[in-house]
From Swiss-Prot:
Belongs to the shikimate kinase family. InterPro entries: P-loop_NTPase, Shikimate/glucono_kinase, Shikimate_kinase/TSH1, Shikimate_kinase_CS. Pathway: Metabolic intermediate biosynthesis; chorismate biosynthesis; chorismate from D-erythrose 4-phosphate and phosphoenolpyruvate: step 5/7. This is Shikimate kinase. It comes from Bacillus subtilis (strain 168). GO terms for cellular component: cytosol. It holds the Pfam family SKI. Its EC number is 2.7.1.71. PANTHER family: SHIKIMATE KINASE (PTHR21087), SHIKIMATE KINASE 1, CHLOROPLASTIC (PTHR21087:SF16). Disulfide bonds: none annotated. Binds 1 Mg(2+) ion per subunit. Catalyzes the specific phosphorylation of the 3-hydroxyl group of shikimic acid using ATP as a cosubstrate. Its cofactor is Mg(2+).
Length: 186
């Protein structure tokens, strides 16, 4: 039996993907509160468990260590937890195993923000995002566009331009509830 069918749609974790700084954590917390679900931010969980910031982990243990740890956390949540709202780090969905597991076992929502709106936030993000360190705006745009191709593998896309986090969260919750009401298990 397909693993996706084994998990009832209402019980599936909701996974938020998108480029760094699009609002996955803020929106995820709001959605979790509105749906009475637990919220898990993968990056925050790793920081807590290792008692280091992501930039420190990159510096002291390396990106490969971080990506391996990130994968372990995400696969565990996908396979062993239900009813969660999960925010993935901006680069985690690049890993095929993570992508496939999330798409098979969860509902994956792509929070989509235009480059024009994202670059207005760039100065606030660079210090806390090691992947952005020492990159020009052109290099950041290239990374943004490369990742967008990966984020196109999702169950649903939510355009977030010119919307507040509260408005995005309300839209997600309303859409999920409609989908859950329409879904009839076979």
């Amino acid at each position: 039996m397909n693993a996706k069918r084994a998990i009832p749609v209402r019980e599936r974790n909701i996974v938020l993907i998108g480029f760094m700084g699009v609002g996955k954590t803020t929106i995820g917390q709001l959605v979790a509160k509105k749906l009475y679900r637990d919220f898990i931010d993968i990056d925050q969980q790793i920081e807590k468990d290792f008692n280091m910031s992501i930039p420190e982990i990159f510096e002291k243990k390396g990106e490969d260590f971080f990506r391996k740890t990130e994968k372990e956390y995400i696969l565990d949540i996908c396979h062993h937890k239900r009813f969660k709202i999960v925010s993935l780090g901006g680069g985690s969905f690049k890993q095929e195993e993570i992508r496939n597991c999330c798409l098979e076992n969860c509902l994956v929502l792509h929070l989509d923000l235009s480059w024009e709106n994202w670059k207005q936030r760039a100065d606030l993000l660079i210090e806390s995002r090691p992947v952005l360190h020492n990159r020009s705006m052109d290099e950041m745009e290239q990374l943004f566009n490369e990742r967008k191709v990966i984020y196109d593998k999702h169950n649903s896309k939510v355009a977030t331009d010119n919307l507040s986090p509260e408005e995005v969260a309300d839209y997600i919750v309303e859409t999920l509830k409609i989908g859950w009401d329409l879904y009839q298990p076979m």
